[in-house]
């Protein structure tokens, strides 16, 4: 068996990236919550 995590920069950004988050209401809430918490990184 292979490892389950096969990292890909493009796929990570497409699924968890900032632009992807901003597309949905829920994603915008995620960004807002992370801003309030003071996260250095808002998204992948």
Curated annotation (Swiss-Prot):
One Pfam family it belongs to: Ribosomal_L34
Compositional bias ranges of the Basic residues kind: 7-22
Region described as Disordered: 1-26
Xref: InterPro entries: Ribosomal_bL34, Ribosomal_bL34_CS
Record GO terms (molecular function): structural constituent of ribosome
Keyword Ribosomal protein set for record: yes
Record keywords, A-Z: Ribonucleoprotein, Ribosomal protein
UniProt GO BP: translation
UniProt GO cellular component terms: ribonucleoprotein complex; ribosome
HAMAP family found in the cross-reference section: Ribosomal_bL34
Family, as annotated: Belongs to the bacterial ribosomal protein bL34 family.
Name listed for the protein in its UniProt record: Large ribosomal subunit protein bL34
Lineage: Bacteria, Bacillati, Bacillota, Clostridia, Lachnospirales
């Amino acid at each position: 068996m292979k490892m389950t995590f096969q990292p890909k920069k493009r796929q990570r950004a497409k699924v968890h990236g900032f632009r992807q988050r901003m597309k949905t209401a829920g994603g915008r809430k995620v960004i807002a919550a992370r801003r309030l918490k003071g996260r250095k990184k808002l998204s992948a």
